[in-house]
């Protein structure tokens, strides 16, 4: 009665809100449950998938499932849902060829600086994509038609977590994942770039090639790949040749082509316990940067911080970076290395690192180089990191949040800014999010300052880089 009476309301906005509320109330009080389940999590256009429609009525209320509509395909049902009797219907379904890949709508187009380009403004503001497959269940409840929508999902049973739901995604028949998002050509015009090719469907073949700027040469011209089973992987290499090119920055794209279409997307999963699985289909591209670099040091010992990508970057420019643990740090081991680096927030991972001071000071006295990176002020004070350092300093909560805030060099002749490579203001171009935070605001006279920066109207932060020479 009440649901039908809502049709008399002329205000469409409030009518829709109240209809939704009553539908949720009907669903809750009858214990009505329904879902649409795919046998796979991801399928390419043209793939055949199996879909199970399931429903149960946990009440004596007279409920009849009349039909289910999926992407304009009507599936007649006409089944009376008797109290606590489970209903299931399985169908085979071909994924339409015209469906777009399920990439996040704000990431389909490559963003520019601080701006995302969205093709369909109707998506704007939505926290995620709407499901590519929506099933509509048409019920007759006590003589009244009530319709509910259900997104297509893949469900597995996890022994510890129970039912594990993943939103069904439309993918490609093939994915290309570059090994690195950025490749650095250091003192060289040629380099092999590695990609991983993954089959998105059974019995699929294509040619993998490169879209490169004019003048950038590569070999081979293409790789022919064939897969028997979905999920198979192959690793391929292309040699990129920048000989004779004056530019130092390039973007290259990888493409897979079959008889009908071409594809230039990879696949990536963001998987954490506290959020639903996020499936991404990023563009298959690599940024190339070419430059010359003088390296006095070759071997670096590194103590990792959480989510630390610095070792990867150092490896790309030719350093040998060994990830060590607290237990491996001793003078004999450190003598093998040109430098020891504490990772970003390394003390968050292992508080006992502060106990390494005797070994590290001996290493420094013998001529070793030690770099301690970013730490928060609370961690600094709670762990009394001042007792770990050779000289005192205090960490503040000061920050430089303006990405383009000018950087000023305070000591242009300092060796750290000139050897083995000269550091100039251009090296601070392209820093994003912010210039820095948790700057030291007090330090011993034994430290030298190299750079300073500040937001408009704020005091300069001279403690971005502090250096002290000890021993050899």
Which role fits each region the language model picked out?
Residues 1-28:
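The feature marks non-catalytic terminal segments
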Residues 21-33, 164-174:
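Proline/serine/threonine-rich low-complexity linkers at boundaries of modular beta-sandwich domains
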Residues 39-289:
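Long beta-sheet-rich domains in secretory-pathway and surface-associated proteins
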Residues 199, 304, 374, 453:
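Short beta-strand/turn micro-motifs composed of small residues
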Residues 262-343, 396:
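Aromatic-Pro/Gly-enriched surface loop or interdomain linker
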Residues 283-286, 326-330, 355-358, 458-465:
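Alpha-helical scaffolding within the catalytic cores
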Residues 345-428:
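A glycine-rich, often tryptophan-bearing local segment used as a flexible ligand/cofactor-contacting loop or short
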Residues 396-472:
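Catalytic beta-strand/loop cores that center a nucleophilic Ser/Cys/Thr
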């Amino acid at each position: 009665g009440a649901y039908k009476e809502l049709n008399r309301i002329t205000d469409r906005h409030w009518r829709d809100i109240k209809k939704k509320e009553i539908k949720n109330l009907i669903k809750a009080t009858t214990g009505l449950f329904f879902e649409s389940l795919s046998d796979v999590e991801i399928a390419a256009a043209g793939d055949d998938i199996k879909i199970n429609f399931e429903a149960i009525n946990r009440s004596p209320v007279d409920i009849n499932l009349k039909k289910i509509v999926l992407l304009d395909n009507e599936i007649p049902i006409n089944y009376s849902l008797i109290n606590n009797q489970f209903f299931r219907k399985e169908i085979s379904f071909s994924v339409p060829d015209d469906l777009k890949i399920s990439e996040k709508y704000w990431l389909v187009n490559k963003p520019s600086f601080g701006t995302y380009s969205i093709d369909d403004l109707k998506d704007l503001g939505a926290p995620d994509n709407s499901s590519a497959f929506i099933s509509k269940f048409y019920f007759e409840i006590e003589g009244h038609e009530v319709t509910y929508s259900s997104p297509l999902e893949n469900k597995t049973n996890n022994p510890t977590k129970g039912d594990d739901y993943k939103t069904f995604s439309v993918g490609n028949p093939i994915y290309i994942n570059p090994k690195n998002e950025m490749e650095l050509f250091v003192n060289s015009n040629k380099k092999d770039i590695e990609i991983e090719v993954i089959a998105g469907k059974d019995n699929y073949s294509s040619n993998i090639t490169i879209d490169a700027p004019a003048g950038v040469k590569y070999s081979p011209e293409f790789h022919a790949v064939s897969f028997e089973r979905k999920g198979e992987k192959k690793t391929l290499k292309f040699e990129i040749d920048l000989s004779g090119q004056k530019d130092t920055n390039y973007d290259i794209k990888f493409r897979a082509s079959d008889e009908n279409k071409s594809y230039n997307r990879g696949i990536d999963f963001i998987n954490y316990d506290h959020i639903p699985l996020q499936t991404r289909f990023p563009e298959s591209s690599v940024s190339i940067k070419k430059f010359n670099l003088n390296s006095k040091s070759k071997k670096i010992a590194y103590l990792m911080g959480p989510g630390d990508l610095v070792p990867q970057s150092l490896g790309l420019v030719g350093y040998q970076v060994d990830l060590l643990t607290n237990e491996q740090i001793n003078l004999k081991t450190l003598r093998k290395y040109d430098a020891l680096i504490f990772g970003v927030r390394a003390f968050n991972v292992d508080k006992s690192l502060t106990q390494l001071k005797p070994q590290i000071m001996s290493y420094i006295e013998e001529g070793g180089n030690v770099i301690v990176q970013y730490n928060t002020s609370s961690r600094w004070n709670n762990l009394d990191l001042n007792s770990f350092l050779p000289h005192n300093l205090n960490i503040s909560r000061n920050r430089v949040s303006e990405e383009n805030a000018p950087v000023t060099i305070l000591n242009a002749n300092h060796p750290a800014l000139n050897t083995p490579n000269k550091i100039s203001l251009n090296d601070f171009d392209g820093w994003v999010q912010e210039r820095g935070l948790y700057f030291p605001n007090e330090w011993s006279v034994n430290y030298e300052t190299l750079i300073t920066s500040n937001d408009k109207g704020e005091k300069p932060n001279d403690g971005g880089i502090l250096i002290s020479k000890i021993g050899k």
